[in-house]
Each structure stands twice: as C-alpha cells, then as structure tokens.
C-alpha cells in the first residue's frame, strides 16, 4: 500500500473518534463513527488473503448494521422529542436502541459473535487497532448518554463478563483469546457505566495499556498460537519474563495493575446493593484468569521441542523491544500502588 494512502487512512482513524468525542449532535457523531469505520476497512483488507477479506466483509456488515440502528434511533428520538442533542436522549425506545447499536459496534455480548472471527482473520497490528483505538468513539458516546434503561446495561455487562471468560477457555489462537478478553473487559466497563462514568474511563484507559502491551509483545515475537509461545523466550527473553505478568494483570490478579479497576468496580457495585451482580462478575474473572494462566504457563514453564522444526523459529532475527512496549508493559504491572493518586486524578 502506498505511504500516502496509509497516511490518509491513519488520519481518518484519528479524525473519526475526534469528531465523535467532540460532537454534541447525533448526526455529526454518526459521521465520525462512519469515518472511523471506512478508514480501517482498507487496512484490514490490505493483505489479500481469503481470511482477511472474509474478516473485513464481516466487520463492514456488522458496523453498517450498527450504524443504521444508531441513525434510526437518533432520528426517532428527534421525531419524538424534537432534539438532536446527545444529552437529550430522554425517550426510552431510542435510548435502548442506541445502547444496543453501540454494544454491537464494540462487541458486547450477546452481540459479540463477530469479534473473535474478525480478529482471527487480521494480522496482529490491525488487530491491535481494532481492539483498542476502535473502542474509543463508541465509548465517547456511551459516556455522554444518560441511560434510561439501567437494567439493560447490567444485563449486557454480566453477559459479557461471563461469555468473555467462558469463550476463551478452549481457544488455542492468541487473537481469539484476546478477543474474548476484550469482551470480558468491556463487560466490566458497561457494568459500572451508570454508577461511575469516571471509573469506566479509568478501566478503559488501563485496558488500552494492558491490551496494547500484550499485542505489541506478540508482534515482536511473531506469535499467533499458544504452542508458538514456547519458543518466545529465545527471541526476547526480557519481554518473555514480563509478558506473563502483563497477562496476569489482564486477569486482574493482585498486586498487579489490572486488579485496581476490578477491585474498585466490585466496591462500587456493593455500595449500590448489587452484591449478586458483583459476585457473578468476580466469578467470571476467575474464568478469564484461567486462560491467562494457560498463556503464562506456555511461555514460562514449557520447553520447545529440540528438533529442526522447533529450533528454526529461535534463529530468526527479531527487532529489539522498543521503549513504548517496555513502558506499557511496566505500566501494566506496577500501577497498583499509585491507586490513591489515580483516584484523585479521576475524581473518583
């Protein structure tokens, strides 16, 4: 792909969420979402492989459906209330439709089935963009909404945490595991959205840091399956020692960074007399923790076969880990002691 085209597409990726996040009008916000979608589709299809083309087609159809639902809901709201403002979503019907449309856009359960399949068909770099940057614009809208249907958000959140944990248990492909991990984390964010939007924002920020560090390490090691992780210690030994901690942090294990949002969310849920919901969410975190432990075990406690097939990947030259990957990995592990400062920063 021409560097000029790539630069234009990356500019579109930056422009779309910026328009959506700064807009207060539904039509402008919808345009920002569509710019974002149209910018990533050529990046997804740049490798002319049947799986990539299939993934791009699935992604386009899903996003087009969600965009049509969103436009229909905002038009219905304007018809019923005479308002196009984001904060004036007062009627329950368009409000529910918009939440479902945004849930389909980001891949919340039970509207999640496209996400693992699409992510599996992409290369790791585009998968990183899809799992992190593409979540920002829909979340910018969700954070501005005043939800009229809190029960729907709780149902979507609990289903996502359970299905995200359950779905990743029998996977061997890293991209599918990270897709189910994404679904589970999005469930935690939606669960707490109506009670503490700033806590949702904090959870989203930490999710972006931890997921980016995992993806960047897999990109450096060129690994896409659990079996290939066994050879990664010979390629980048320092990162291989850090990545299991990053994965356990994604699972929410103390004393790592990922424990912070889960701990704060469970505390907030119990404050609002939702102890059964908090219990279900905590149990679903154990499901997710199991497949993160599988990955950590494959990286640290297994030895690759000592034959020609197993030895060849060790001898490939890899690029040296860059500063961004190292910084993100460190942030994914070491931020828990800074919880009081972070809470003050976010006014939680």
UniProtKB/Swiss-Prot annotation:
Its main location: mitochondrion. It is an enzyme of class 7 (translocase). Coiled coil: none annotated. One of its GO terms (molecular function) is NADH dehydrogenase (ubiquinone) activity. It catalyses: a ubiquinone + NADH + 5 H(+)(in) = a ubiquinol + NAD(+) + 4 H(+)(out). One of its GO terms (cellular component) is mitochondrial inner membrane. It is found in: Mitochondrion inner membrane. It is a multi-pass membrane protein. The keyword rRNA-binding does not apply. The chain crosses the membrane at residues 1-21, 60-80, 96-116, 149-169, 177-194, 198-220, 238-258, 273-293, 328-348. The keyword Signal does not apply. Keywords: Electron transport, Membrane, Mitochondrion, Mitochondrion inner membrane, NAD, Respiratory chain, Translocase, Transmembrane, Transmembrane helix, Transport, Ubiquinone. It comes from the Eukaryota. It holds the Pfam family NADH_dehy_S2_C. Its EC number is 7.1.1.2. GO terms for biological process: mitochondrial electron transport, NADH to ubiquinone. Core subunit of the mitochondrial membrane respiratory chain NADH dehydrogenase (Complex I) that is believed to belong to the minimal assembly required for catalysis. Complex I functions in the transfer of electrons from NADH to the respiratory chain. The immediate electron acceptor for the enzyme is believed to be ubiquinone. Belongs to the complex I subunit 2 family. PANTHER family: NADH-UBIQUINONE OXIDOREDUCTASE CHAIN 2. This is NADH-ubiquinone oxidoreductase chain 2. It comes from Tetraodon nigroviridis. The gene is MT-ND2.
